[in-house]
Regions:
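Catalytic cores of the polymerase beta-like nucleotidyltransferase superfamily
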Residues: 1-258
């Protein structure tokens, strides 16, 4: 697919650049000087546009994990399947990931131990990296050095209109990784973003897919979900979408009895 990003000057978005992590900028500069492309990516940019102070700053690059590791002696490789690199500055950790493709070329579609569909996850281009991300508001890249946002899928528009939209077909993307349903609840409650009717229906109709997901992954998402500080909203939305009864079959019975 030929995808041309909309390049948006940061100055037009009223972003407070002072709150961008100096360490993340250091990492990007060093990658750039070594001949690689590197961007701030994802939730940190979404939050900057919303004028929320980001908790973490993640970097995406075309450098591969071993190449990144060689450049930063304060770094270590993390993760079995996707090797991420964590670079430590004092008590701050910058997570650096290589652009990945989710190649649909391989017909053997398997589930890994974590219940996600896996294809051969190879490294890819920035365009491929965009398409494997879940929500459009998170598929956004910031070129810190040129002060431009690369927007491939209408991310800025979604963030401004507070909409949570999956990239691609709702049902396909949920089947590919059912945990996206929990993430949809997390982002919509945390950010006050609305879900389209088709996405609401897709979640409602596919809530039973959470049964295939190992409890360790659900637990991880659950912690993030309830750490938001919007527990009541989250709880009501989880019931509305039929997600709670899939995760805690007995809990909902109890609650109905009381």
């Amino acid at each position: 697919k030929n995808m041309t990003p909309n390049k948006i000057k940061v100055s037009s978005l009223n972003i407070n650049e002072k709150i961008i992590s100096k360490s993340a900028i250091k990492v990007i500069k060093k990658l750039d000087q070594s001949g690689y492309k590197a961007f701030l990516v994802g939730g940190c940019i979404r939050d900057l546009i919303l004028d929320i102070r980001p908790k973490d700053f993640d970097v995406a690059t075309d450098a591969q994990p071993q190449q990144i590791k060689r450049l930063f002696r304060n770094s270590k490789l993390i993760g079995r399947r996707f090797r991420l690199v964590h670079i430590r500055y004092g008590n701050e950790i910058i997570e650096v990931a290589t652009f990945r493709s989710s190649s649909n070329s391989s017909k053997k579609i398997l589930r890994d131990q974590d219940g996600r569909l896996i294809r051969d996850n190879e490294y890819g281009t920035i365009e491929e990296d965009v398409l494997r991300r879940d929500f459009r508001c998170n598929a956004i890249y910031y070129d810190v050095l040129k002060k431009r946002i690369f927007d491939f899928v209408g991310s800025v528009q979604d963030i401004r209109s507070k909409k949570l939209v999956l990239i691609g077909n709702d049902i396909d993307r949920i089947r590919e990784d059912p945990v996206r349903m929990i993430r949809a609840v997390r982002f919509s409650t945390k950010l006050g973003f609305s879900l389209s009717d088709t996405l609401r229906k897709a979640i409602f109709d596919n809530s039973n897919l959470l049964r295939n997901v190992p409890s360790a992954r659900i637990f991880d998402e659950f912690i993030k979900l309830f750490m938001n500080g919007f527990a009541e909203k989250v709880y009501l939305q989880m019931i509305e979408f039929g997600l709670l009864k899939e995760i805690f079959p007995n809990l909902e019975k109890e609650l109905n009895n009381n």
